[in-house]
Amino acid sequence: MPTVDIFNTNRDVVGQLELSDAVFAVPLRPHVLHEVVLYQLAKRRAGTVKTKGRSDVAGGGKKPWRQKGTGRARAGTSRSPIWRGGGTIHGPQPRDYEMRIPKKVRRLAVKMALSQKLIDRELTVLDQLQLEQIKTRDFAAILDRFELSKTLVVIAQPDEKLQKSARNIPNVKVLRTEGLNVYDLLNHRSVLLTRETIGKIEETLGS
């Protein structure tokens, strides 16, 4: 069973915490992470882009000139794709990018990502994370103290002071445990958790 040091906001070790093997000791299978990241990115796509083909472009119903006798190349419509103002050949059309991945696989991928963060020592656990006021400088000072950059902060409960203090700091994102996902875990170098957050994550994913 892996253990981690628990810090206060001054970076003093105040204890240790045993982590669940079912959540923080899951062997890495890169292809599972890859599939789930593709699934998440695909769900973000609207799939509404559309170009007009020759049958969609307005006009072009009349033959531009007679078939023979003008010396010009034959033409049946002024909306041919080779004409200026004509339709587009093989342009993008509306499509559904949806992928289906079982919920068990998505949960497994989150556990793998958390386990890898622990192995890479990119997981920082605080006893608690509470700000006295909405102050970006105060929260930035905590991150600097732990030498954290591009950080994902996962909280167990809504915290307006923390969320508003963090939103103007570049490369810092605050998520509730309900929104914890593989893409954000992999896209951020460091993950900042609290003791309460870990308890909630283990309760959700450990079953």
Swiss-Prot record:
InterPro entries: Ribosomal_uL4 (IPR002136), Ribosomal_uL4-like (IPR013005), Ribosomal_uL4_dom_sf (IPR023574). Pfam families: Ribosomal_L4. It comes from the Bacteria. Keywords: Ribonucleoprotein, Ribosomal protein, RNA-binding, rRNA-binding. GO terms for cellular component: ribonucleoprotein complex; ribosome. GO terms for molecular function: rRNA binding; structural constituent of ribosome. Residues 50-96 are annotated as: Disordered. This is Large ribosomal subunit protein uL4. It comes from Syntrophobacter fumaroxidans (strain DSM 10017 / MPOB). The lineage of its organism: Bacteria, Pseudomonadati, Thermodesulfobacteriota, Syntrophobacteria, Syntrophobacterales. The gene is rplD.
